């Protein structure tokens, strides 16, 4: 054993792989019938950083999951992974508005002085430093529709986050500048400097908005192939969505990062440690309260929420308290416990029919290390990558904020696109046993009559 392997910042990758992972092969009978490839094989041959037993060294001063996690909260890392966005407004048919931020790095976003910059009447003006990074698309902008065939990555952020988060920008910057992908970030309601227009926010099982967003993007860009990556609560939403869509999937491949697969267990775990109960949970609760205060006038249009806000808002200190009083009842659940148990994304893993990779650090201080390994190993479409360290959406390589996962994950998506999607390889289902896709339904998902 080498000395560096004894260091607490030494990272080791461990894979949890189904016994018979899905193999992709050509449907053209003229091709060599034996020529096929699985996701683990693709990783081992093309992305060795993610192979089983791969090693690396993270930032030496961040010697555990707590420090890796906290470092991402204390700094914004504005000098690295710089991204410019243009924002599209989505008007949901089920009420309210959402926003999608498209990466436009390297493209001219300047307007002539005589041309007034478009700002939707329902949304805030970007001022100060935000104005350098964000602007709005007008609804009739021709760039919102294209016949090009470039691959596009859709990213879902974590709790109260958005396209501005450094963990999101790391992926957006890498995949657009190095791998010729288009990228956009789906901002949840009320997040990332966006205004809500109805008294409704979102939760870890609310898949209606992302479903509408994906369908809308496919209409705008009919020739593109779509990929997904979700972080933390965004990974929960993404996993639930993919499990519900099952073999109707419109996504070529998806990656889940630091997913709280079991919301109930995660809520318990975060409050079971001194750091969790004294720092993480109050910090996340503070972010949720700030989001509510930013949209207070609209939320109070619902008299039930107005009553709760007036009576309890000042008493809320943790995520669980927030979900018990606001999130749960807002979406028809009796309390936080009922919401957590119904919306936990591990329940939708059996329904996934999209090539799916989950990345998780064993020292994640927010989610914990209790992962749905049995469910993942029972689905030939899914694969788990566990690292010995990295924290919750951390994996910092150095002081500058460089992330260990950004380059290899983006390279994997590029290789998957080139070697499987573009070549038209299809999953060989002849000799695999798929789990029953009929998962427990999410109570809040809209269903056709």
Curated annotation (Swiss-Prot):
Keywords, alphabetical: Hydrolase, Isopeptide bond, Serine esterase, Ubl conjugation
Pfam family, one: Abhydrolase_1
Residue window of motif GXSXG: 230-234
Thermal response of activity: Optimum temperature is 30 degrees Celsius for MAG lipase activity. Optimum temperature is 45 degrees Celsius for p-nitrophenyl palmitate and 30 degrees Celsius for both p-nitrophenyl acetate and p-nitrophenyl butyrate.
All residue ranges annotated as the AB hydrolase-1 domain in the record: 151-392
EC number: 3.1.1.23
Keyword Magnesium set for record: no
GO terms (BP aspect): medium-chain fatty acid biosynthetic process; medium-chain fatty acid catabolic process; triglyceride metabolic process
Active-site positions on this chain: 232 (nucleophile), 364 (charge relay system), 392 (charge relay system)
Cross-referenced Gene3D superfamilies: alpha/beta hydrolase
SUPFAM superfamilies for the chain: alpha/beta-Hydrolases
Keyword Hydrolase: yes
GO molecular function: acetylesterase activity; acyltransferase activity; monoacylglycerol lipase activity; triacylglycerol lipase activity
Residues in cross-link Glycyl lysine isopeptide (Lys-Gly) (interchain with G-Cter in ubiquitin): 82
Catalytic activity: Hydrolyzes glycerol monoesters of long-chain fatty acids; 1-hexadecanoylglycerol + H2O = glycerol + hexadecanoate + H(+); 1-octadecanoylglycerol + H2O = octadecanoate + glycerol + H(+); 1-(9Z-octadecenoyl)-glycerol + H2O = glycerol + (9Z)-octadecenoate + H(+)
Coiled coil: none
Function text: Converts monoacylglycerides (MAG) to free fatty acids and glycerol. Has a preference for palmitoyl-MAG. Does not play a significant role in ethyl ester biosynthesis. Also possesses ester hydrolase and low but persistent TAG lipase activity.
Family: Belongs to the AB hydrolase superfamily. AB hydrolase 4 family.
Protein's name in the database: Monoacylglycerol lipase
Gene giving rise to this polypeptide: MGL2
């Amino acid at each position: 054993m080498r000395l560096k392997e004894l260091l607490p910042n030494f990272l080791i990758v461990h894979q949890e792989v189904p016994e018979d992972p899905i193999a992709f092969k050509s449907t053209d009978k003229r091709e060599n019938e034996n020529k096929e490839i699985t996701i683990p094989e693709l990783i081992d041959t093309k992305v060795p950083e993610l192979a089983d037993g791969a090693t690396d060294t993270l930032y030496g001063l961040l010697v555990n999951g707590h420090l890796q996690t906290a470092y991402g909260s204390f700094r914004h890392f504005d000098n690295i992974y710089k991204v410019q966005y243009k924002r599209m407004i989505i008007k949901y048919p089920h009420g309210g508005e959402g926003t999608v931020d498209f990466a436009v790095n390297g493209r001219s976003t300047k307007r002539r002085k005589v041309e007034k910059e478009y700002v939707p009447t329902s949304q805030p003006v970007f001022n100060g430093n935000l104005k350098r990074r964000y602007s709005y698309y007008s609804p009739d902008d021709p760039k919102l529709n294209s016949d090009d065939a470039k691959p596009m990555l859709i990213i879902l952020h974590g709790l109260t986050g958005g396209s501005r988060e450094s963990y999101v920008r790391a992926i957006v910057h890498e995949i657009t500048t190095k791998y010729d992908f288009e990228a956009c970030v789906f901002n949840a309601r009320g997040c990332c400097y966006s205004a809500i227009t109805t008294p409704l926010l979102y939760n870890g099982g609310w898949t209606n908005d992302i479903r509408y967003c994906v369908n809308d993007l496919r209409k705008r860009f009919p020739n593109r192939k779509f990929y997904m990556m979700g972080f933390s609560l965004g990974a929960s939403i993404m996993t639930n969505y993919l499990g519900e869509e099952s073999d109707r999937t419109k996504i070529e491949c998806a990656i889940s990062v630091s997913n709280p697969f079991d919301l109930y267990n995660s809520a318990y775990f975060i409050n079971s440690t001194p750091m969790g109960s004294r720092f993480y949970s109050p910090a996340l609760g503070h972010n949720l309260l700030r989001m509510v205060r930013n949209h207070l006038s609209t939320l109070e249009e619902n008299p039930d929420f107005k009553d709760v806000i007036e009576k309890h808002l000042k008493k809320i200190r943790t995520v669980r308290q927030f979900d018990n009083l606001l999130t749960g009842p807002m979406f028809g659940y009796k309390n936080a416990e009922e919401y957590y148990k119904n919306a936990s994304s591990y329940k939708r893993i059996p329904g996934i029919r999209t090539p799916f990779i989950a990345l998780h650090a064993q020292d994640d201080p927010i989610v914990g290390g209790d992962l749905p390994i049995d469910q993942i190993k029972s689905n030939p479409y899914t694969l788990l990558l566990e690292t010995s360290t990295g924290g919750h959406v951390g994996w910092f390589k150095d002081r500058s904020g460089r992330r260990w996962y950004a380059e290899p994950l983006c390279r994997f998506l590029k290789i998957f696109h080139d070697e499987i999607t573009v070549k038209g390889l299809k999953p060989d289902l002849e000799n695999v046993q798929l789990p029953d896709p009929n998962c427990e339904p999410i109570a809040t998902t809209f269903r056709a009559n």
